[in-house]
Amino acid sequence: MNPERFAVAPRRRWLGLAAAAALAAAATPWLAGCERGADRPALRGIDVTGAPYGRALSLTDQYGQRRTLQDFRGKVVMLYFGFVQCPDVCPTALARAVEVLQRLGPDAERVQLLFVTVDPERDTPALLRDYMAAFHPSFLGLTGTPEEIATAAREFKVYYAKVPTGSGYTMDHSAQTYLIDAQGRLRIVLKHERTADDYAHDIAWLLRGGA
């Protein structure tokens, strides 16, 4: 598997997925206030409030800046682990994140997507810059040494493994998304199968205080 072809050729596919997400979102706007009267609307993800994991993260973004969860206080963080050469699960997750931001409208400014690579060997900062930019200018790709990635994965109970292929290797990995509230606390885990509406629903709840 040639890493260079993921730096150029798939960009059209990434852009196509992002554009499709934006169009879908425009056609089905998210009404964030539809459940404001409820004390605690039923969450679409798994409530993990108070979990003894997912409390720390320290990696480097695609611009070379060290990032921790403290940097995003005041925002809800969508945290996802994946890799650039992922054929469909990762680009689908990122395209869905674009839809989520569209549904949230002005509140999207208080949401940050963090994409942690589980393939630091191939996912260089330059490649992460291209990959993130293909979806949304605010998305941040995080990388580090193999040891740092392993530490982050353990902290969030993420599984990943290198799987040999005939021409190189691919990565097997968990596909859930973690929602971290504006105080930097892990609150919700959303499965990959959930829709953009499900994600927007739970994020909107966290933006309203999550209580």
Identify the meaning behind each predicted range.
Residues 1-29:
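N-terminal secretory signal peptides
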Residues 35-37:
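Bacterial signal peptide processing site
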Residues 42-61:
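Post-signal peptide N-terminal segment of mature Sec-exported envelope proteins
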Residues 58-77:
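A short beta-strand-turn-helix
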Residues 71-91:
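Short active-site neighborhood of thiol/selenol oxidoreductases, capturing the structured segment around
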Residues 92-152:
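Structural microenvironment flanking redox-active thiols in thiol-disulfide oxidoreductases
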Residues 146-168:
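Thioredoxin-like thiol-disulfide oxidoreductase module
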Residues 166-211:
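Thiol-/selenol-based redox modules, centered on thioredoxin-like
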